[in-house]
Amino acid sequence: MRSAGLVALLAVALQAAEPVVIAHRGASGILPEHTRESKIAAHRMGADYLEQDVVLSKDDVPIVLHDVHLDTTTDVAEKFSDRRRKDGRYYAIDLTAAEIATLTATERFDHRTGKQVMPLRHPKGKGVFRVPTLEQELALIAELNRTGGRRAGIYPELKAPSWHRKEGKDLAGIVLPILRKNGYATQSDPCYLQCFEYAEVKRIREELGWKGSVIMLLGGNKGVDGTDFAALKTDAGLKGLAGLVDGIGPSLTDIIKDGKATDLIARAHKAGLKVHPYTFRADALPKGVKDVAEAARIIFKDAGADGLFTDHPDKVLEALGR
């Protein structure tokens, strides 16, 4: 556990550090999420970190995909109609990595209606985009860092580990060795590992021995695995998290209420935790916020965020004067 003196020093350091800009699924505000093209654009924009949501394929290959389902961002229903489950959905875990590689990725749409979720973004069905594996993405980022002359970090999320376990697969057990093999293993490496499930975060630290930076993601009240988010947001909950993780990732709705900053970040800093809220979208501003500049002021100056997940890294970087 951290001493009171160390926690106080961490709180001061957190407030002094320049905030990091995290490309949420890449530059997903202008290109289909988690595609190679989206990550290249985000890197060129200058994002500090590029996010990877990670799920498993049938043959245990980590895939960069936001959901365990494939039917909201690909043409899986057209190419593999026989893989539809009784609930009407198509799961990455039911296709091999080679099969997933044949799918065409597109802008997110409602799997029931086929309508694009964000109609003013990249047109659904336009262009040829693919779903990458984690290994492919890490290789891409390494090459972008080499040719771009700067080292952008990675920000992988273990998606639904308890669901994967029910399906007979150990997501973290497969992903962590790949991260280590690619040079992401310690606190000094530019990598934040994130997850919404408290039990899995605890397992990552205590059972799997992960020494790198970890962010505990916080949802509304209770997670599908039983994680009590409301309790974790209390002073006692934040203090308890400080002995396990490096920071928290709350929703922007917990940071901004009717155009005003809440006290969550200040309380987290007091506990010695970094705070990287999600997700800022320039085309869907928080309630009570008139533009990107005002949002940046509230999030970084008033609330004191140490970083921000955004679909529009270029706009956030501009607001920060970078």
Set out the residue ranges of the language-model regions:
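Sec-dependent N-terminal signal peptides
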Residues: 3-13
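Phosphate-group recognition and catalysis centered on beta-loop-alpha active-site segments
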Residues: 14-322
